[in-house]
Amino acid sequence: MTGARGATMTGARGATMTGALVARVLTDVSGIDKEFDYTVPAHLADEAQVGCKVRVDLAGRRVGGWIVALGELSRDPDLAISPEGSRPALKAVAALRGWGPTADLVDLAAWAAWRWAANRALFLGTASSRNTVRHLPAPRLAPPAPPPALRLPTGPGAHVVAIGPAEDPTVIVAQAAQLGPLLVIVPTASRAAVLARRLRRAGGDVALLPEEWAQARAGAAVIVGSRGAAWAPCPGVAAVVVIDAHDELHTSERAPTWNSVGVAVERAERAGVPCYLITSCPGPELVALGPTTTFEAAKQKAGWASMQLVDQRSEDPRLGLYSSRLVDLLRSTEKVACVLNTTGRVRLLACGACGTVARCDVCHAAVSSPEPGVLSCQGCGAMRPYVCASCTSIRLSWLRVGTSRAREDLERLGGRDVGEVTAATKDFPSSSVLVGTEALLRRLDPSSGFATIVFLDFDRELLAARFGAAEHSLALLSTASRLVRGAAGLVVVQTRMPDHPVLQAATVGDPAVALSEEDSARRALRLPPYGALALISGAGGEAWIASLRERHDGTVEVMGPNDGKWLVKAPDHRRLCDLLRSVGPPGGNVRVAVDPQRL
């Protein structure tokens, strides 16, 4: 391994001999976000550089880590003299383990640790190859052929690019690649592989992550991968693209809840290059990041599938989720995919008299009944009497059914074999009728021939206990439109709220119909992007929150506990993240979720 030395180290511990090369190392030991200084043996000095992976001795055992800074003692004789005035003897780096993240990613990891209340090692691990890389191939920098007559804004920072759900983003990627080395982030690994094949057919040199990390580190015209690709090395990066920037798969559900959109935008701003956020659902948080560009508005609307809304309030109550329209589809010869989200995100109460779903008067989320005579919001906690807001009936009942039960019912109603798909499904069924959770939408391919997608109970999404429920619901309809190839396909939505702005927006193919109302609601409730949130939970949450309360300046609101969770709301991310950092890194018994997807 060879390479130039990285950044100059300042404020580091000293070494025992003048002129010695000292490496500041961040270890990969879980729970330790502290740097340690080591001398670099002479035979390794020419190869050591910021970002490279090393092995060092720490507390009696050998551990891995990364060099985060390098310096020569002779250039700063005051390096880390101990409080007693002596220079402690430093251990030597035991071994270099190969190429690691570039120096800019080492700096970016420090920012991400502040932004999402985490340790830097987690991000440096994501930025590193899964395998040891000791030798790099030659750079491959031939871009794909440019598309005809497509111009993109080239200013630095975020640019929101609005397209239709069924539009192919490959042409935008190919155009962006003309600027120079390009980093592309896609929601799923399977879609990243498809995009890589298309770009290669267009003559582009592509590194597909994670398998081709070494080529990315050496240099490639286009580097493509899923969420972790936001941390991929991209020497000389000239632009960044995030495809389906609205997709929640860009956000980690596990703490730290970092998202590739935020990392991509920050990375582009630091490099002074454009970051194109391609989306069919430009929600409030995306729009707040930068100006929006729309290509061919008519084509964008045509990318939405034909939407057919089935008002379940007018259906025979005995049919439950199985409307007469659904039964007709099942008894036809069409290939039908049915989506029923049973991940436990929300349980719905509906009026037995008029069929209206009970929801919060304040934030419109679903409500529950924690005690007799009371309805409580699962989102904001607001309470109201146990009556239907539409007809004042007190005959409310739970709506529940799972995918396994639904599969049996669909087989009986349609007389066809029905395949079930969940996140745990390994072998994808070959049935012409499928039922599953959102995992079905993730694994279905536009070439599979399913021209009809049915959402059996879409109200679960519209009323989910999350501040982005409307945006996420619209994103699901966008995904369905892409899978059925836009206007050529059909999306059937069973609902008790056919007038909901999300459904009206999808019907007319104009996301602004729903997202403008969503923006107004967020502004009124001081939700992102007009505020910043963190959700604290875990056995040690109470003590951690007590420490936080002692430090905040009154501009931060702490709500809870509610079911063992605390919600911290701040005017902006700077004040929120500074406060979280002042408390210190959360231990193993505390979970801190910044920008939580679900409350």
Each PLM stretch: what is its role?
Residues 293-362, 507-510, 518:
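Conserved helicase motor core of P-loop NTPases
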Residues 98-102, 166, 185, 189, ...:
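Conserved phosphate/pyrophosphate-binding and hydrolysis machinery centered on Walker-type P-loop NTPases
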Residues 326-412:
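Cys/His-rich short segments
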Residues 202-212, 361-362, 370, 414-423, ...:
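Conserved RecA-like helicase motor-core motifs
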Residues 45-48, 64, 102-106, 217, ...:
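Amphipathic alpha-helical transducer elements in NTP-driven molecular machines
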Residues 1-310, 317, 331-332, 354, ...:
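Accessory, non-ATPase domains that flank or precede helicase/AAA+ motor cores in DNA-metabolism machines
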Residues 50-58, 282, 324-334, 409, ...:
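C-terminal helicase module of SF1/SF2 nucleic-acid helicases/translocases
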